[in-house]
Structures are given as structure tokens and as C-alpha cells.
Amino acid sequence: MPFTPLHFGPHALVGLSFEKRLDLPVFLGANIAVDLEPLMVMSLGLPYPLHGIFHTFPVGGLAGLVFATLCFPFRGHLNRLMKYLRLPYATSYTKMAVSGILGAWLHILFDSVMYYDITPFYPFQANPLLGLLS
């Protein structure tokens, strides 16, 4: 489900645990960006799977990379935000890119365990992660 609060807590925990290696705002933002796809499907009533191509590791990773690239020019604003939150922040394009990809992938991993309509290893149609934790 788009923007589920169940994603934010675990992703924030991972992001904060690796704050020196990850760009926290990009990591968390990429995790949310992946759910723009189901939001559009529901909002516009599109005849498309709720969890479609963006919920695959290849395309989701690419979406995370694009998100990081779009955030790169705004790193000064992100720096001010992190200072306001009293969180350390030092970034680079590489750090942002890796954070975007990993943020998207973690989101897909979480959803793959719960939702039957996800094919995380596209083009393979199976989801071996479905029900893994049940």
C-alpha cells in the first residue's frame, strides 16, 4: 500500500544505523519514491498491476538511482535539513546513488514478502520471497 507507515520505521532504523555510509534523506526518499507507482495506479484507476515494474529489483534500483540523481543538486538543502535535525551529514554523488538504490531495494524486499503481485526478480515471474516470514 502506498506510503505505508510500516516501511518508515524499519527503513529509518536501517538508515540511522548506517548513517555514516548512507545518505539518510535519499535512502528514505527512494523508499517512498518506489510507491509512486501504486499511488498513480490507484489515483488514476490505471489498468496496471498495483505493484508493477517499479517493484522489481532492476527497475526499482534504477528508480532509486534516478531519485538520487535528482536529489544531488539539492544536497545543500538536505545538509541544512540534517543540521536542523541535529544529524551528521556528509555526502557525495556516489553515496547518494548507493543510498537511492539500496533504499528502493529494501522497500522491494519488504513488499516482496507480503504482496503476491510482486515479481522482484523480473523478468522471472516467480516471487520466492512471498510469505517468507509468515
Residue ranges of each PLM-predicted region?
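N-terminal membrane-targeting hydrophobic helices
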Residues: 1-134
